[in-house]
Amino acid sequence: MNKMSPLYVLALCCLATTVFAKYDCTNNGGYGCKYGGTCHFYGFCICPKGFQGEDCGLKTELISTAANCTAECKNGGTCYESDRCYCPHGFIGDMCEIPDTVARCAPDRMIIEAYRPLGFVGEVYMFQNRKSCALKQVPSDIRDMMKLERVVLHSDKTECALTRTPDTPKLGDVTMKTTVVSTHNYNQFGPRDSIMDVSCVHTNSFQGSTKEITETAFPFRMVALDMNGEPVQALAANESIILQFEPVGIPDVRGVMVEYLEVYSINANSNEVVSKTIIENGCVLRTAQQHLEIPIRNYSEMXRQGTSWVARSAMRAFILLPGDHCYSSLDYASVPEVPR
């Protein structure tokens, strides 16, 4: 049995402000009426008896009552066949939990995602430029849907750059925002197309009270060592360093290993965040070694006292942002027995 103790230094959340257009069966590319429904001139479906929904895709007799439904349909989804959800236009996913156009946050970038029907023949792009800021098709993780995506770095200085608003919505927060255009026909914008705002919020994780934490309250001890095993406080770039972690104050735990290690720096003036994931699922990422141009090892070995196994991440000191401190986000896995 593994006991995980995640420690997160940087808090991220994703907020999307989206204006959804109504379903319009006159649009090209997979927006018709199903099961013999008739598309009205004004864009709504006239469904045959026994069917309902914006595209007539829901058979009335299959709709489940609240007592018979085991699915938690969100965003106005309708439960049918006890455990399935029929989603309104603008939402997808098994539980209708995913907006069809949304932004996700990463420490240094925004990922804009748009899901459209497989027959979609239109375009999705950032409003600044239809061609150079377009979302491109990528492999989809939603069945029977096409996925379009664009990754924009927070530091992007091109015409596709994001709008940055500090201290929004709260003091210390930073909101990254852009406007996305979705059309149903290539190189055309009509009254049935949509324009929507999407945004990501970096929440302020630096406010709080100072509190002394004992070894009993804090389950692991971390120390930075030089190659001779002596503690260090500061290093020059490219000097060897070992980050050592050992369990303290947890009964029956005989060892620890690093499952995930991410380092990042925050520019003191612009709040720009630069991050690099070094270890994931206990393995050193080759891309991190190549990008940082340093050797990295992640391993466990017996402590000097011979009573427990300690985790060690060995590398050379490096700089992400000149003049700014490095921070870390870590996941540890504790081992209840000494490995044999």
Curated annotation (Swiss-Prot):
Membrane spanning stretches: none
SUPFAM superfamilies: EGF/Laminin (SSF57196)
Species annotation: Magallana gigas
UniProt-recorded name of the protein: Gigasin-2
GO cellular component: cell surface; extracellular region
InterPro entries: Dev_Signal_Modulators, EGF-like_dom
KW Cell membrane (keyword) present: no
Cystine pairs: 25-39, 33-45, 47-56, 69-79, 73-85, 87-96
Signal sequence extent: 1-21
Keyword flag Repeat: yes
Molecular-function GO term, any one: signaling receptor binding
Classification via PANTHER family: EGF-LIKE-DOMAIN, MULTIPLE 7, EGF-LIKE-DOMAIN, MULTIPLE 7, 8
Lineage of producing organism: Eukaryota, Metazoa, Spiralia, Lophotrochozoa, Mollusca
Keyword annotations from UniProtKB, A to Z: Disulfide bond, EGF-like domain, Repeat, Signal
Superkingdom field: Eukaryota
CDD domains membership: EGF_CA (cd00054)
Tissue: Component of the organic matrix of calcified shell layers.
Domain EGF-like, first and last residues per copy: 22-57, 65-97
